[in-house]
């Protein structure tokens, strides 16, 4: 079968009619998002990675294959095929004896820095190998089936020369590894020496058991138990030969199951007090095994704080009941009426101790879901000088036009991130009631978001017909697979698209007229790519990124990693489900809104269990908890670093971007205080670039006024606007135990002077010195796209690059999209000649001069010059006069003109304007 759609027909048995009436199912269902073909604007393209080792029964619908699940290495061309079922790791043994190897990963420490452990990982050895005589020559391995929710998969092993097969189910949390033999002769082996079987020496005999139970004691002090459904099975010891380990070989072929499990406690002297209880429990449930999982989610119809999800395990075997491992975030939340805790634990590689539960139905109640707001309320701002500074920067930052290459260039991640940062200015303008600024802001966002909608951005999104998803076309080009962080191979989709969806949600909220069916379908397509809730969607897999068993998403797609799937940015994980929720609110889709609320709550709790490490965290080694955050989190390794560097500000900052209204629900004051005092306070002053602002925003949770003062002069860039950082800091709420928000006296925000440089407009006819552009700063008197004043010789507090030339100055380092504004007084109406003193070693530069409207980039502005091409003058200091005839009249009186750089690469000394004689 292609994919199993699990519809819980027995749900009414779990809930009374009255209870069912207050809950709304949010998945799986077919009407939360449309199932139609993705919009035609998404060009159809084939991925350069194709699935391998997939059974022919799945060939007709490859778009249903999951890319980011725990077993996806079975479908790609990598060095091994492994599945992190956890607590075990199951993989294919690609050397004799062929078959399935079962590893219980054991933790070991890596590098230290002082008293902190920088990373730890787990060993993976061939603790048990389940093979068959018929696989001695070769083996063929195929992924034969999987469930919709990413909880299980079925793998088949066979030989092209021998009849029969082996099948194994890869199920998250399975307590036993189960292999179904079909007319195959089982073999059991280990990389460790098998010392005893059922208490007897392993060699020199055939081992039998009237119950089909074989206790294997290994020389690493572990005990494994093998359960055979065929109680007549005999296992004969065969000594090791060359590189082939010794095996316990069955005396005959069988059709039935072998199940193997590790006793959770090692053999010690004296024995662990729960050793016997663990063995008894494993024996009791040895006859029943899970084959699939299904998922159902609900939101309360009237209480947005309440949601729940159900994982139902399908079983086979003797019906004795299911024994299954659960992570810490499940253990105290699973409804006891359907699943029972046993108090028997086995450590997972990176998520603490897993506990054995009994029962086939897990219902997890989430009764403290976070509140959802567009923006923190301005009522939190209690100091008028903070408000004045916010308004000062809001006006300045909104006035700077967006550049297409910055918000819609070759990276969807960076482009959409920058666009969302600007979009947050719109939210502030709306909250503060600044209608004019809001309209200007929304115009900019809408115009640039159209680049994505029209697929004219630098990395156009296309529909992948191989795996069923939306990817960037740049990564499909030969030799360019790493483009946009390997997003064409399903890396980081929930990070990238979270920003896009967030922008769309804000546009829909603040400008409802923007919404139409085409835009809704386009944005919904991105949601379907990452998080389709519909098990019957024929174009996208269900819940590609989100792992309902782990409680969070995985960023790694079709790229192999020895330590399993990974994720480093928990805040961007949250941002996707927050953005999806807000999109649901803005468009009136209550099902998507409800699902987003639930997933945000689930991931928030999981993040605080495993990624953000308070002092009392029990899920990681104590010396690793001292880092306060995990860094790169794999399924079987945790490394206090990032993919882009090991600076402390990177490692912590990536867990805190973007800051939104949901952030305070994820990062509470207790954690922020510990993180600040133990890791951030000592590095913040030397943090690179904008990262110090990110760290100060976290500090604002416990000291908002001190943080606000720091943010006035800390870094900012296109991805984090100073306005938003200040607003977020100023609106931090009070807290009783972990913050104080001490009073800080701020300087007054400047009153922005605008207009002519000297206070008097330049008289026309006459000369205008290039460096005497208008007052008002960035976005008013000028727009400069590179940081700082590169010349630093004149007006050093402003970003225009000015250098000494002769007895005066010139403006240099001109870049695409920059402009200079000049206020002039025109003596009489008419057309005017212009002579520009320019210098350039190339003939690539160009500009034009406009007047009216909002200047450069405003279609209503009057172009006074047409495009002016700058010639090669022989060098940066060889200035030449460039004459340009006026082609549009200027009216007498005061006006503003803008010199708009089209293509940079030239210097400007001055320009003269004289009356054109007609």
Identify the meaning behind each predicted range:
Residues 1-9:
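Classical eukaryotic N-terminal signal peptides for Sec-dependent ER targeting/secretion
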Residues 3, 19-482, 486-487, 491-492, ...:
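Ser/Thr/Asn(+Pro)-rich, low-complexity disordered segments
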Residues 409-430, 487-527, 569-577:
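Aromatic-rich carbohydrate-recognition surfaces in CAZymes
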Residues 429-443, 508-523, 584-597:
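Structural helix-adjacent loops and short alpha-helical linkers that scaffold large soluble proteins
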Residues 519-527, 547-548, 593-604, 840:
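Active/binding-pocket-proximal capping segment
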Residues 570-574, 579-603:
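Active-site neighborhood of glycoside hydrolase catalytic domains
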Residues 750-918:
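Extracytoplasmic
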């Amino acid at each position: 079968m292609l994919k199993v759609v699990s519809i819980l027909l027995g749900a009414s048995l779990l809930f009374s009619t009255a209870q069912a009436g207050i809950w709304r199912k949010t998945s799986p269902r077919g009407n939360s998002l449309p199932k139609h073909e993705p919009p035609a604007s998404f060009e159809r393209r084939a991925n350069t990675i194709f699935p391998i080792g997939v059974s022919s029964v799945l060939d007709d619908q490859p778009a249903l294959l999951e890319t980011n699940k725990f077993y996806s290495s079975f479908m790609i061309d990598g060095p091994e095929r492994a599945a992190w079922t956890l607590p075990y790791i199951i993989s294919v043994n690609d050397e004799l004896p062929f078959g399935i190897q079962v590893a219980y990963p054991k933790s070991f420490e890596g590098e230290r820095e002082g008293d902190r452990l920088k990373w730890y990982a787990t060993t993976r050895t061939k603790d048990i190998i389940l093979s068959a005589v018929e696989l001695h020559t070769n083996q063929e391995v195929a992924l034969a089936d999987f469930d919709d929710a990413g909880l299980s998969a079925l793998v088949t092993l066979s030989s092209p020369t021998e009849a029969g097969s082996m099948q194994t189910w890869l199920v998250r949390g399975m307590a036993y590894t189960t292999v179904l033999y079909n007319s195959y002769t089982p073999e059991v082996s280990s990389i460790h020496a098998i010392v005893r079987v059922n208490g007897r020496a392993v060699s020199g005999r055939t081992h039998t058991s009237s119950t089909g139970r074989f206790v294997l004691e290994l020389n690493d002090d572990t005990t494994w138990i093998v359960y055979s459904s065929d109680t007549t099975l005999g296992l004969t010891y065969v000594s090791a030969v060359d590189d082939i380990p010794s095996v316990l070989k069955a005396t005959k072929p069988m059709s039935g199951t072998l199940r193997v499990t590790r006793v959770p406690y090692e053999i010690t002297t004296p024995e662990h007090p729960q050793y016997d209880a663990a063995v008894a429990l494993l024996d009791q449930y040895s006859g029943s095994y899970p084959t699939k999982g299904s998922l159902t989610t609900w939101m309360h119809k009237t209480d947005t704080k309440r949601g729940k999800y159900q994982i139902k395990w399908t079983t086979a075997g003797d019906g004795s009941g299911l024994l299954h491992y659960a992570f810490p975030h499940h253990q105290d939340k699973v409804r006891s009426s359907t699943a029972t805790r046993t108090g028997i634990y086995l450590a997972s590689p990176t998520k603490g101790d897993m506990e054995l539960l009994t029962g086939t139905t897990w219902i997890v109640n989430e009764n403290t879901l976070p509140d959802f707001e567009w923006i923190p309320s301005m009522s939190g701002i209690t100091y008028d000088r903070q408000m004045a500074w916010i308004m000062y920067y809001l006006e300045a930052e909104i006035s700077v036009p967006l550049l297409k290459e910055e918000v819609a260039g070759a990276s969807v991640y960076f482009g959409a991130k920058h666009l969302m940062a600007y979009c947050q200015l719109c939210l502030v303008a709306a909250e503060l009631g600044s209608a004019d600024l809001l309209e200007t802001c929304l115009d900019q966002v809408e115009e640039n978001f159209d680049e994505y909608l029209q697929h004219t951005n630098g990395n156009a999104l296309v529909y992948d017909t191989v795996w069923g998803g939306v990817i960037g076309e740049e990564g499909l080009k030969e030799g360019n697979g790493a483009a946009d962080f390997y997003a064409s191979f399903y890396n980081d989709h929930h990070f990238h698209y979270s920003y896009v969806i967030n922008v769309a949600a804000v546009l829909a909220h603040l400008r409802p007229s923007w919404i139409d069916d085409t835009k809704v379908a386009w944005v919904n397509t991105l949601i379907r790519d990452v998080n389709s809730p519909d098990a019957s969607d024929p174009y996208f897999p269900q819940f590609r990124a989100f792992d309902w068993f782990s409680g969070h998403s995985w960023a790694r797609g079709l790229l192999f990693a020895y330590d399993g799937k990974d994720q480093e940015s928990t805040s961007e994980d949250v941002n996707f489900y927050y953005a999806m929720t807000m999109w649901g609110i803005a468009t009136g889709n209550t099902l998507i809104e409800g699902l987003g609320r639930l997933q945000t709550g689930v991931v928030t709790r999981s993040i605080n269990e495993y990624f953000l490490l308070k002092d009392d965290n029990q899920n990681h080694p104590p010396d690793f908890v001292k880092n306060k955050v995990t860094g790169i989190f794999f399924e079987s390794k945790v490394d206090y670093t990032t993919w882009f560097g090991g600076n402390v500000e990177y490692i912590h900052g990536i867990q805190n971007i973007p800051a939104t209204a949901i952030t305070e629900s994820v990062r509470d004051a207790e954690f922020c205080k510990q993180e600040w005092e133990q890791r951030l306070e000592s590095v913040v002053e030397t943090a690179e670039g904008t990262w110090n602002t990110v760290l100060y925003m976290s500090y604002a949770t416990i000291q908002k006024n001190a943080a606000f003062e720091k943010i006035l002069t800390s870094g900012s860039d296109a991805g984090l606007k100073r306005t938003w950082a200040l607003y977020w800091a100023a609106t931090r709420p009070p807290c009783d135990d972990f913050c104080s928000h001490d009073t800080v006296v701020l300087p007054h925000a400047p009153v922005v002077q605008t207009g002519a440089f000297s206070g008097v407009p330049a008289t026309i006819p006459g000369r205008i010195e290039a460096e005497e552009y208008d007052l008002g700063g960035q976005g008013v008197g000028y727009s400069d796209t590179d940081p700082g004043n590169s010349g630093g010789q004149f007006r050093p507090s402003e970003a225009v690059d000015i250098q000494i030339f002769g007895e005066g100055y010139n403006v240099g380092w001109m870049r695409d999209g920059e402009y200079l504004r000049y206020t002039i007084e025109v003596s009489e109406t008419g057309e005017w000649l212009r002579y520009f003193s320019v210098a350039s070693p190339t003939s690539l530069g160009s500009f034009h001069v406009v007047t009216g409207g909002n200047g450069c980039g405003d279609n209503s502005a009057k172009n006074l010059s047409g495009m002016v091409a700058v010639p090669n003058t022989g060098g940066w200091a060889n200035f030449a006069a460039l004459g340009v005839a006026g082609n549009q009249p200027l009216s007498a009186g005061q006006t503003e003109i803008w010199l708009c750089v089209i293509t940079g690469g030239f210097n400007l000394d001055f320009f003269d304007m004289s009356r054109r004689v007609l």
